[in-house]
């Protein structure tokens, strides 16, 4: 295990104290005042990275706030930790692992030696194997057991083996060009698998079982049920034609009946929530093809290079991560809304939930000591304009501060005329995007509402206080490269915050105990004889009620 030196308490540093005092001075200042005093901030508090134009001017920060936040980042040695990550140092200290999701998108001619191996060569060996396989699948050379070509791939995974591929597949659905669609199964609830397979033909269905160890309970339970669905229809010999694996466990893959030539590996330096650009993205490559998948990877790399080389003062992921930390630790915010004005990004907020909350939802620092401040932003959201008719009421007039990220595109992939036939529905969508960020920031005062002739007793109900912060991220079009850029933008925000909090953003011990306890409880709830009493009266009563309603002795 890598030795971990005692970390300094960031909250006890002069840089933290300077921010606290700065907050005391400006924390209640309204965005209206910020814009009046600094009329150029709407043009100047922006940064462009690749295809992403990022406007952070509608945040409750001044140029001095940003300077102090950058000082805090340097106090936490953010640049040094960033360089260690890119170099393959074992910064995942609790598991003694390198953190190299950035290596997954390095170009073929790059070299990165980690633990004696050129990991770039390893990455491209797997990418080449994925490309060769998906070429065969997409051309119809690979067929099912009956000789029919595959028309549906079903990805069976959970967590990072599911959330990433689901999100990317939906976001890039327009790039499907070979007559192959994808579906996804993750939940051990049998309803998930049953509903997914209900209208599929076993003869034209291929399963991708994604599990690094090939022992994940939910994934193997679903995979076994899927294998039964195939063998009942096509016989045992069909398994090799209808299953491939994303795993590193050859023995268990072979035992399952999958030809290990059709096993695609990845590495322990890739965490699940950072793995959609690895072999975990095989289902995506099957649908959009290897060239579009390469464009997807190139988008990540654009932001990686920016994060690695840009000064902190103009480094987009660093600035956005620092602003998120400003709200979490100094302004009292607990969550961040992610609001894509693109229905194709409907699962983006759910994807970011795992990325951010599994990474930074920690109460122990990397050296084993307790944290001394709040950590981990709670991410949530829905696409616009749906969210406007669901929860924006709280954003506008509620008592909780919820910074929001708005994501939109200038050029639609889909468009239709508006009701009168002369306008663009995409223009209507984006007019809502711009209006919401404007109204959240500047609101509407009682005087302005009264001047419109509103009855006095109604005026208080219509006041929009404003001063609700947001980031606007605008790109030309949702392409594979742009999607990669967006994901990397958030990956490196997570890293930035984690370094300052002094936590290990790349382990997830908090998910383990529940899985262990579930295994222990399974025989208790299924046994024919009376179950042993549980250690707490609540669980004991719940188990007994469940057993009774399942017709078992309680």
Swiss-Prot record:
Keywords: Cytoplasm, Gluconeogenesis, Glycolysis, Isomerase
Compositional bias of kind Basic and acidic residues: 542-554
EC number: 5.3.1.9
Coiled-coil annotated spans: none
Major localization class: cytoplasm
Enzyme class name: isomerase
Catalytic activity as recorded in UniProt: alpha-D-glucose 6-phosphate = beta-D-fructose 6-phosphate
GO cellular component: cytosol
Protein name (database record): Glucose-6-phosphate isomerase
Organism of provenance: Mycolicibacterium paratuberculosis (strain ATCC BAA-968 / K-10)
Gene: pgi
């Amino acid at each position: 295990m890598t030795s971990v030196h005692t970390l300094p308490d960031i909250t006890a540093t002069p840089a933290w104290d300077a921010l606290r005092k700065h907050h005391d001075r400006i924390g209640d200042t309204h965005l209206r005042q910020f814009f009046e005093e600094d009329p150029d901030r709407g043009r100047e508090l922006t940064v462009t990275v690749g295809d992403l134009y990022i406007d952070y001017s509608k945040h409750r920060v001044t140029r001095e706030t940003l300077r102090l936040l950058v000082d805090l980042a340097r106090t936490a040695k953010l640049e040094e930790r960033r360089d260690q990550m890119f170099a393959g140092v074992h910064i995942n200290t609790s598991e003694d692992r390198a953190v190299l999701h950035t290596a997954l998108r390095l170009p073929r001619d790059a070299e990165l030696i980690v633990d004696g191996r050129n990991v770039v060569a390893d990455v491209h060996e797997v990418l080449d194997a994925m490309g060769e396989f998906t070429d065969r699948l997409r051309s119809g050379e690979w067929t099912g057991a009956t000789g029919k070509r595959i028309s549906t791939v079903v990805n069976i995974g959970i967590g990072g083996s599911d959330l990433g591929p689901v999100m990317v597949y939906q976001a890039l659905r327009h790039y499907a060009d070979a007559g192959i669609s994808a579906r996804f199964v993750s939940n051990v609830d049998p309803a998930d698998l049953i509903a997914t397979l209900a209208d599929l033909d076993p003869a034209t269905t291929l399963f991708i079982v994604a599990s690094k160890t090939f022992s994940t309970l939910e994934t193997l339970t679903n995979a076994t049920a899927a294998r039964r669905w195939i063998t009942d229809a096509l016989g045992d010999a069909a398994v090799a034609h209808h299953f491939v694996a994303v795993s590193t466990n050859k023995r268990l893959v072979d035992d399952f009946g999958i030809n290990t030539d059709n096993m695609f590996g990845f590495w322990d330096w890739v965490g699940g929530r950072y793995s959609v650009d690895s072999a975990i993205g095989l289902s995506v490559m099957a649908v959009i093809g290897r060239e579009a998948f390469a464009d997807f990877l190139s988008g990540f790399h654009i932001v990686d290079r920016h994060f690695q080389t840009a000064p902190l003062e103009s480094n987009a992921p660093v600035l956005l991560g620092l602003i998120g930390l400003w709200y979490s630790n100094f302004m009292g915010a607990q969550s961040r809304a992610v609001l894509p004005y693109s229905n194709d990004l409907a699962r983006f907020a759910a994807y970011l939930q795992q990325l951010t909350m599994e990474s930074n939802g920690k109460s122990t620092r990397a050296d084993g000591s307790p944290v001394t401040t709040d950590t981990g932003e709670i991410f949530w959201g829905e696409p616009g304009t749906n969210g406007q008719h669901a929860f924006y009421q709280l954003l506008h007039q509620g008592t909780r501060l919820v910074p929001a990220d708005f994501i939109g595109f200038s050029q639609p992939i889909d468009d239709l005329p508006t009701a009168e036939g002369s306008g663009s529905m995409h223009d209507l969508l984006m007019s809502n995007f711009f209006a919401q960020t404007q109204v959240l920031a500047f609101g509407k005062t009682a005087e302005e509402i009264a001047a419109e002739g509103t009855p006095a007793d109604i005026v208080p109900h219509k006041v929009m206080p404003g001063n609700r912060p947001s980031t606007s991220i605008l790109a030309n079009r949702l392409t594979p490269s742009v999607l990669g850029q967006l994901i990397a933008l958030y990956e490196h925000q997570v890293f930035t915050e984690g370094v300052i909090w002094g936590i290990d953003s790349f382990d997830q011990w908090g998910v383990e105990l529940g899985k262990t306890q579930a295994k222990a409880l399974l025989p208790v709830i299924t046994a024919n004889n009376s179950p042993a009493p549980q250690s707490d009266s609540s669980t004991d009563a719940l188990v007994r009620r469940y057993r009774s309603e399942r017709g078992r002795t309680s």
